[in-house]
Every structure is written in structure tokens, then in C-alpha cells.
Amino acid sequence: MSNSHPLRPFTAVGEIDHVHILSEHIGALLIGEEYGDVTFVVEKKRFPAHRVILAARCQYFRALLYGGMRESQPEAEIPLQDTTAEAFTMLLKYIYTGRATLTDEKEEVLLDFLSLAHKYGFPELEDSTSEYLCTILNIQNVCMTFDVASLYSLPKLTCMCCMFMDRNAQEVLSSEGFLSLSKTALLNIVLRDSFAAPEKDIFLALLNWCKHNSKENHAEIMQAVRLPLMSLTELLNVVRPSGLLSPDAILDAIKVRSESRDMDLNYRGMLIPEENIATMKYGAQVVKGELKSALLDGDTQNYDLDHGFSRHPIDDDCRSGIEIKLGQPSIINHIRILLWDRDSRSYSYFIEVSMDELDWVRVIDHSQYLCRSWQKLYFPARVCRYIRIVGTHNTVNKIFHIVAFECMFTNKTFTLEKGLIVPMENVATIADCASVIEGVSRSRNALLNGDTKNYDWDSGYTCHQLGSGAIVVQLAQPYMIGSIRLLLWDCDDRSYSYYVEVSTNQQQWTMVADRTKVSCKSWQSVTFERQPASFIRIVGTHNTANEVFHCVHFECPEQQSSQKEENSEESGTGDTSLAGQQLDSHALRAPSGSSLPSSPGSNSRSPNRQHQ
């Protein structure tokens, strides 16, 4: 027996879902005029409708049709202005069925439809229509779409329009839609640093807009032109004959151009957020340095002593360097570089940016710091075309090596102090390329692996002999640090004493915590005046159980959320006797010149206990 019913959506047993049938039946009321009790007139076309359905779907119609006004009278005819019959037909279909077909409609109808969704208070429809408009943006429709998105404060659609116009600035300037922009929308576009068309083209487009919009204030429009970015020839032969700018304004622009540093001019640049633009895709190339081809190939795994990096000799006058030319002037505030890290060497360096290869501005200065592996660098946003990395020191030889280079604009928030990042998250992690360069452990970086649960008498900690050596952590790059947190080995009731020092070069050390006269157990929170740090040295001075200082976990800066989690979890711990367990010292490899420490249980002078 055939089934004439359409396929129904799957529902759970015991649940009935016939919403699609309801939509079809209510939608059928639109076909005829049965039961209609109100009529809308749009562009002389009559639209019969049903008050109760409109009121149930829309607060606007509820107030209009049941608010005691003239429109609430039986069989009323309501004329609607500022819309089209096509758009209103789509809206009624959506109200009655919850469906709308956008793909076959012209952009003008879709924008009218979006306007109705906004006017009558259908936020979900507004969002869905905006999302579709984002997918069909082109040179012909982007300006009128931006105008509507700005008028109704639609952030996602506005942002997508801006990104499209930024990447197609010159084509947008010459489009017919540009001439139809409102003054507010026009200024919002051309005032953006990322609207990166030549200033002469922007001036000519604004001049053309002024001719088509003669009633607007032309002086206000022309203030958006960045005259100092134009050449003397352009100012005299293009701007001056237009008569829209005073001779004083032109002379002021010439003065600024001649007296200012080039990098102080208010340049425009391409903006592509969260995407590396130092790639062949965007036309970037390495123009100075040795072994240029390796730097931008994207390979951050296959490199060794012989290949996979770019380099330059380190000289005293810093004339050598590695220079990257971007495909076009771009706005950046974030650079990532991978320093060669197949051994324990460290480097020092600085980074400068320029528009013309003559005037350079230093955005990163790590020339006095020791750095290794991945460098995650942030600075105030700059427009630049050229980027120069100059190595000033290598702890092994006189060559500076870089494996990879990336640059971009990021919307990620960051805080800078004295040119260094003030980290909010723990940067003493393996993922952030921190490492333990002094101290003994079964696993080299057990101190930094984030495991604060799985440790016992034999493993899970880093240690050093009291009176000999220390535990030293090297961060990948200098940070402004004002706190650290330690977990001292606490599988019994012993206590420790210690002090903490920080350094940027392993030569000069500053003590930030002195707990040599304090009995310390388990979690240690250390706060101090914020200062630059690349190295943190923890020196144990006393252990009530034996002659070894043991540390399970290290982080900086201190992570408050994890502190609370640890406190809540520790409240349920218990004790178990583990007398007689010893560390297999043959599993450890002590640094040269250091004596091999014993396990926490060796020479114990206190009861042996361990967390369950």
C-alpha cells in the first residue's frame, strides 16, 4: 500500500513533531483571502492577512493591530511606505511559514527584506539574511550592503563588508555603488587605516562623490584625505586644481611631508587578521640574508646543522641582517620567529620595520636578552612593507640562525610593559618552549609538564643537592614577570627552605623571594615587583628530611584558577606508609660538576607518607 504522506523528520519515541505540517497549513492561508481581517497596501498591491497570526509572530504588529489605533479597526486597510511589494511578500511568507528563499532574489530586494526584518523586530531573520548577504558580496553590491548594515548597526555584516572593501579598495572606489554611499558610510570607509588604496585614487573618488552629492559638506569629506601621503607632484597637479582644498592645507601637507620621519606618516595598509602574510601567497619574499629560501617555506620540523634555516653573520655594527619584503604595505602587530634550537644555545636580536628601507623603527629589542626557540612577539600595530631581523649574539658562535618567520595582525589582547609582554597565562610550559637547564630529573622537563598529581618517591620531580647547584628554568623569551608558583615535593610532612632569583642573561641575578628562614611545604605562591625575566633560579637551602631540594611543578606567572582547584582537591587526600622505597640513582644523569642527589626518602628523618 503506498504512503501518500511526505517523509517526516525523525523524532524520539513518544514525541510527535508535525511542525512542518503546521507550517504548510498556516502558509496555505496566504494563497486566498479566506478569514482575512486586515489588508496591507504596498506599491498599490493589496495583501490580505490575519491579525491574530501577525500579532502572534511580531510585537510590532501586535501593537499596531490591537493597540486601539485606527489600524485596529475591523477590515482596516493599512498602507506601508518605504518598502517594496517583493520584499513584503517574502516577509509575509516568513511570518506564516517560518521559511524564506533568498537565493533567487536580487540584492535590492534582499536589502529591503533585511530592512523589514529589522523594522518589525525579527532578530533571527535579520541574522540569517545578514549571513547570506555576507556570502554574495561583490564589487557591485558591497557599498549599498554596507550602507544598510551601518544604518541598522549589524556588526557581523558591517565587518564583512569592511573586510571585502579593504581587500578590493581600488575597485570599490571606481564602482557605481561608491557614489551612492551616505556621507556617514563614506567616511567610515575611507577613514580606515586598512582601506589601502593609493591616496591619489581616494582623493579622486571623493572628488567624484562630491560632484554627485552636491548638497553635502565637501570640506568635511576632504578632511578624510591624507594629504601628506601624496607626492608633491600630486598635490600641485591633482589636488590644487580641484579647488576643494585651500592653499594653506596643501602647504601644511608639504610641510608635514618634508619635516616628518617617513614612519611617522599615517600610512594605510592591508589588514588580514589572524593570518600569516609572510608567505608566497601574499607576495612576501626574503630580500637579504643567506639561504633565503628556507625562511618562508613553512617547514618548522625538518632542519638541522646543515639546512632548513636562514642566517647572517653577527657583526659589531649590526649592518648584517635578514630582511623580508611583504607583498604590499600591511598592518601588523604580531611576529613569530623560530630560532634554531637543536641544542641549548641562545640568541639575542632586534626587529625593525620600514616602509622605504631608509627609515627604520625598532618594534622589538631583545638585544640584551637571551632567547631560544619560538619567539611570540607583540607590539603596537604598525603599517610596514619591510621587516628586518638583526641578530646581535649567539652563545655558541657568531652566526644568527632563523628557521621560520611569520607576521600578522591579531585581535588577541595583550599587555606590554617596557616593550615586553606581561603574560596572563603560564609561559613556563613545554608548549611555550620553556626548558629546565639545570636540575636533575628522570624526565628533563618534568617540572614544566603541568602534571601536579602523578609524582611519588621515584619520579615526577626535579631536584638538586643542597649547597651545590640549583634548579634553573629558561623561558623562551623575556617577559615582565611578577609572580611564580611552585609545588614542593609533599609526599610526607617534611619542609623546605629556599630562595628565588631571576635574570635576563644568566650573569646578573636579582633575588625576588627569600624563604631561607621559613619552613615551607607543598604549594608556594611568590609575588614580587614586576620585572624582566628570561631565567628563574630556585635554590634550596634546607630540607628537614635529607640534603636534597625537590620541586614537582613550576609556573609563571601564578595561575589563580589552578590554585583554587588544587586547594579544593587537596582537602580529600590521605596518607599511606611507603617505608623502605629508594630512588634508583642510575636512572638519573647529573649535570657536569654536580653530585647526584638522592630520592626524597633517603636519610629521612620524618615519617614516610604519600598521597593516595
Curated annotation (Swiss-Prot):
One of its GO terms (cellular component) is glutamatergic synapse. It comes from the Eukaryota. Residues 588-612 have a biased composition (Low complexity). Residues 36-104 form the BTB domain. Signal peptide: none annotated. Pfam families: BACK, BTB, F5_F8_type_C. Residues 560-612 are annotated as: Disordered. Transmembrane segments: none annotated. Residues 142-240 form the BACK domain. Residues 573-584 have a biased composition (Polar residues). InterPro entries: BACK, BTB/POZ_dom, BTB_POZ_domain_cont_9, BTBD9_BACK-like_dom, FA58C, Galactose-bd-like_sf, SKP1/BTB/POZ_sf. GO terms for biological process: adult locomotory behavior; circadian behavior; circadian sleep/wake cycle, non-REM sleep; long-term memory; modulation of chemical synaptic transmission; multicellular organismal-level iron ion homeostasis; regulation of synaptic vesicle endocytosis; sensory perception of temperature stimulus. It is linked to Restless legs syndrome 6: A neurologic sleep/wake disorder characterized by uncomfortable and unpleasant sensations in the legs that appear at rest, usually at night, inducing an irresistible desire to move the legs. The disorder results in nocturnal insomnia and chronic sleep deprivation. The majority of patients also have periodic limb movements in sleep, which are characterized by involuntary, highly stereotypical, regularly occurring limb movements that occur during sleep. This is BTB/POZ domain-containing protein 9. It comes from Homo sapiens.
